[in-house]
């Protein structure tokens, strides 16, 4: 039994023959610290996942889509006419589906005037946090807040604007939302006087699909104002792309869009007769859709990835250490070797 206790199938080098190196220990410590940093980074990616964006052909068949709008127009509600016309030549009068409130026209603070917002794709977590569906409120009689029978009417505001808001379903084909005045372009029972028409406007909300009021869109909080030419024609060209956001089982189906805007002065288009004063939103739906998803590796894939990366780094570190040690010995001599440092017992008489 005593022989078995002293038996070692894998004999090791005795301590008296080992040469310890401070430089070698330092490089090993740096290697281990770097491996620990890599492992910590990989654990962070495993728990946090990564964002994957793909462009795919839109396979869903959608007959209609919803347009959400909240707009201030510098014209009285009585003179406005709102239509939708698409490439099927289907004309839809949508005044009855929208809410119209009389209001004193104004431009809210922090609104971009004669400009549009920068077009960006929002972050996945931002979308999931702000994708709260909502509906527009009911119409209010804004004049009821003021006593118009008061003989002193100097304090009463001028109701020179119209608040247009609501959601309308339209055919999911290329089309145009038209905000014009009665008798302009279409036959109407009443004719709007040109001197009372001003198409300066503020867009608080303009989006496609389900109504998520907290998600920003390129036209949100923008305004167009031209004091000298109130009958200016404003045209917005939008290109709509369906976008699906997916994370941990939650899905948010939205629609992003890019936009270009143009304006035409009444004096320039009146002679041609091809455009009428108003606000026009031309929309086109792209055949592609964007899928933004949060992707996570399985635990087995994570372990294989971590072991492979750490093994490769150790292999590279060993070769770098060996090559650097050989270079130091060749250029500066054996005493600069990273593997060991000779002590006093191993030094020769001439080295002391």
Swiss-Prot record:
Q: How does it sit in the membrane?
A: Multi-pass membrane protein
Report the principal subcellular site.
Answer: endoplasmic reticulum
What's an example Gene Ontology biological process for this entry? protein transport
Q: Where can the motif Isoleucine-leucine motif be found?
A: 349-350
- UniProt keyword Iron, yes or no: no
What Gene Ontology molecular function terms does this protein carry?
Answer: identical protein binding
One Pfam family recorded for the sequence: COPIIcoated_ERV
Any Gene Ontology CC annotation: endoplasmic reticulum membrane
Known InterPro entries for this protein? Erv (IPR045888), Erv_C (IPR012936), Erv_N (IPR039542)
Q: Which residues cross the membrane?
A: 24-44, 312-332
Cytoplasmic topological segments: 1-23, 333-352
Keywords annotated in UniProt: Cytoplasmic vesicle, Endoplasmic reticulum, ER-Golgi transport, Golgi apparatus, Membrane, Protein transport, Transmembrane, Transmembrane helix, Transport
Per UniProt, subcellular location reads as: Endoplasmic reticulum membrane; Golgi apparatus membrane; Cytoplasmic vesicle, COPII-coated vesicle membrane
Residue ranges in the Lumenal topological domain are 45-311
Similarity comment text for this entry: Belongs to the ERGIC family.
Query: How does the annotation summarize its subunit structure?
Result: Interacts with ERV46.
**What does the UniProt function comment say about this protein?**
Constituent of COPII-coated endoplasmic reticulum-derived transport vesicles. Required for efficient transport of a subset of secretory proteins to the Golgi. The C-terminal Ile-Leu motif is required for exit from the endoplasmic reticulum. Facilitates retrograde transport from the Golgi to the endoplasmic reticulum.
Other facts: Present with 3000 molecules/cell in log phase SD medium.
This chain belongs to the protein called ER-derived vesicles protein ERV41
Q: What is the lineage of its organism?
A: Eukaryota, Fungi, Dikarya, Ascomycota, Saccharomycotina
């Amino acid at each position: 039994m005593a022989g078995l206790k002293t038996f070692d199938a894998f004999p090791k080098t005795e301590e008296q023959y080992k040469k310890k190196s401070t430089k070698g220990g330092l490089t090993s410590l740096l290697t281990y610290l770097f491996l620990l940093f890599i492992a910590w980074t990989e654990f962070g990616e495993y728990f946090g996942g990564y964002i994957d964006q793909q462009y795919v052909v839109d396979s869903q068949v959608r007959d209609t889509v919803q347009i959400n709008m909240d707009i201030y127009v510098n014209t009285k509600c009585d003179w406005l006419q709102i239509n939708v016309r698409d490439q099927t030549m289907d004309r839809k009068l949508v005044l009855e589906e929208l809410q119209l409130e009389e209001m004193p026209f104004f431009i809210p603070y922090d609104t971009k005037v004669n400009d549009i917002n920068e077009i960006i794709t929002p972050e996945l977590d931002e979308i999931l946090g702000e994708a709260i569906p909502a509906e527009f409120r009911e119409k209010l009689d804004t004049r009821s807040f003021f006593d118009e029978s008061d003989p002193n009417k100097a304090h009463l505001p001028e109701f020179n604007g119209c608040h247009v808001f609501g959601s309308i379903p339209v055919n999911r084909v290329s089309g145009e939302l038209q905000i014009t005045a009665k008798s302009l372009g279409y036959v109407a029972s009443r004719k709007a006087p040109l001197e009372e028409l001003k198409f300066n406007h503020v867009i608080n909300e303009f989006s496609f699909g389900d109504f998520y009021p907290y998600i920003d869109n390129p036209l949100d909080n923008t305004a167009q104002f031209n004091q000298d030419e109130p009958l200016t024609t404003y045209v917005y060209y939008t290109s709509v792309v369906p976008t699906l956001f997916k994370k941990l089982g939650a899905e948010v189906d939205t629609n992003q869009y890019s936009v270009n805007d143009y304006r035409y002065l009444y004096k320039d288009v009146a002679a041609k007769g091809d455009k009428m004063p108003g606000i026009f939103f031309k929309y086109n739906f792209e055949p592609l859709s964007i899928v933004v998803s949060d992707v996570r590796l399985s635990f087995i894939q994570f372990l294989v990835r971590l072991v492979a990366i750490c093994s490769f780094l150790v292999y590279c570190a060993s070769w770098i250490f060996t090559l650097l040690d050989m270079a130091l010995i060749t250029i500066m001599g054996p005493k600069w070797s990273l593997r060991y440092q000779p002590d006093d017992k191993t030094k020769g008489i001439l080295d002391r």
